[in-house]
Each structure stands twice: as structure tokens, then as C-alpha cells.
Amino acid sequence: MEGTVKWFNSQKGYGFIIDSERKDVFVHQNSIKMDGFRHLNEDDIVNFELGAGKNGREQAINVQPILTRKMVEDSLKEEKLYVKTMKDAFGNKAYMVVDQNNVIQSSEQGMSFLDLAAYAGFDTEGLSA
């Protein structure tokens, strides 16, 4: 199943994913399938399965990142562009792109993570955040 990272505390090694039914699902770093330091960022899009944790409670297992903020940032860096976070007019988290002189290259109102990924050239069709 697909989900969006709600939050993840890298120091403590856990966080929550919002699943397709808008339910919070616990995730522990031991369940993340990636090389190196296992962590997630808010708004990362992941695939996961539901399973039982060590305490028997339901949690996300076999978590695999699909589209991450780091992937988007790395792609934009090649063009000497950078991501800034902001709050939109409704107080929601939004993103904008700036160049090395801090000149805005995207909408001043900000955009969603999926819009940011599309701006960076990623195929976001079929993904939901």
C-alpha cells in the first residue's frame, strides 16, 4: 500500500505514515528498506505493508521510499536550484524553489510536494500525497 510520511524523528528512529484511508500507521526505522542511515522525511511517499511489530501491534513493515524530498532536492541541485519550505495562505506546509541568489523560481504561493516533484522533472502520475 502507498502512504505519505506524516513525521519521522530520526534521533528516536520512529514516526508515522498516513495511509490511503487517512489513518496514522506507526513506522520504526528497522522496517525501512534503504541503504545507509534509515530515515524518512515529512511528505516522503512510500510503499509499505501492514504487519505486527515486536509488541504485537499493527505497524508499517517493508517500507520502501518511492519519492523523497532528498531525491527532489538532489535533482534540483544539478540545476543549482534549492527547496525552501513555507506556509501557504491557509497555514499548510508548502514548497518553493529558489536559485543560488535566493531568487524565487517557482510560484510565490508555494506548491505541494507532488507539484514540487513534478517541477523537478519526476513523473508523479498515479501518486497521492
Where are these regions (language model features)?
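Structural detector for short beta-strands of small beta-barrel domains
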Residues: 1-9
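OB-fold/S1-family single-stranded nucleic acid-binding modules
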Residues: 51-67
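Short nucleic-acid-contacting surface segments enriched for D/E, G, S/T with interspersed K/R
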Residues: 34-47
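Short aromatic-glycine-enriched beta-strand elements
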Residues: 12-17
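Beta-strand/loop nucleic-acid-binding surfaces
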Residues: 24-36
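Negatively charged, low-complexity tracts enriched in Asp/Glu with abundant Ser/Thr
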Residues: 65-80
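Detector for the mature cores of small, proteolytically processed
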Residues: 92-129
